[in-house]
């Protein structure tokens, strides 16, 4: 209640000017040590202070809310909403605990250790590409491509499909926050295509397992349980979106 008494008027998080000059909008709040801000259109609260964030994350009275935020914006159906219903980041215990335990089974110490040489190789390849141009945008040429390339490699997604993965994940990420109608439509279209692609990928790994993360997720077990097809698809897509 003390925090809410000092929360300023709501902020439109979809305003491009906000992200072009965030310091001009948030600077006064931070300098005055205002602890939180409201997100216009959702009733959501942004916490700014590390201690408050840690306390909120450990408070059992607070939860992930599932798809409630989407529904509050009138987005109640379609591929994006369905994906979020099965997305680990939108779940609370015990569902979240179960999925996390299964996914952790697939991220073995050996698999994580093998990422270092892969990461070095990909980084060198991207830097070599950058050196061929007189001027480059580091974000577009490296920062955006590097993590997605690593995740795609872990999932054994062919190099030829990496560009399509980037387009899909860009559309999905554009739909987070307070998306426009066109952004919602693009995200739904991207999710529908990704679900089909990932479904085919899972079927291939079921019939011909490899030493990749998809195969690891398929065969991961915890207390006799494993991921079903819907959970597998949602998890693989979440890894790709997180790696964007």
Label every PLM stretch briefly:
Residues 89, 108, 112, 203, ...:
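Alpha-solenoid HEAT/Armadillo repeat architecture
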Residues 1-139, 151-166, 170-180, 185-189:
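Active-site substrate-recognition loop segments, prototypically the cytochrome P450 B′-helix/B-C loop
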Residues 93, 112, 159, 207, ...:
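Alpha-helix boundary/capping and short turn/kink residues
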């Amino acid at each position: 209640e003390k925090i809410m008494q000092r929360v300023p008027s709501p902020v439109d998080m979809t305003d491009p000017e906000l992200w072009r000059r965030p310091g001009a909008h948030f600077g006064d709040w931070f300098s005055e040590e205002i602890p939180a801000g409201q997100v216009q259109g959702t009733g959501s609260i942004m916490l700014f202070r590390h201690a408050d964030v840690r306390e909120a994350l450990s408070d059992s009275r607070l939860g992930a809310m599932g798809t409630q935020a989407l529904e509050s914006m009138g987005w109640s159906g379609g591929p994006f909403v369905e994906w979020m219903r099965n997305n680990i980041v939108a779940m609370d215990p015990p569902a979240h605990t179960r999925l996390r335990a299964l996914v952790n089974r697939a991220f073995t110490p050996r698999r994580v250790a093998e990422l270092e040489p892969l990461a070095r190789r990909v980084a060198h390849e991207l830097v070599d590409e950058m050196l061929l141009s007189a001027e480059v945008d580091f974000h577009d040429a490296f920062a955006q491509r590097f993590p997605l390339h690593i995740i795609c490699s872990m999932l054994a997604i062919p190099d030829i499909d990496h560009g399509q993965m980037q387009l899909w994940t860009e559309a999905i990420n554009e739909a987070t926050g307070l998306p426009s109608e066109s952004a919602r439509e693009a995200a739904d279209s991207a999710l529908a295509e990704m679900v089909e692609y990932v479904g085919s990928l899972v079927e291939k790994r079921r019939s011909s397992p490899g030493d990749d993360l998809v195969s690891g997720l398929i065969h991961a077990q915890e207390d006799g349980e494993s991921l079903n097809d819907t959970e597998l698809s949602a998890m693989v897509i979440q890894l790709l979106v997180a790696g964007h």
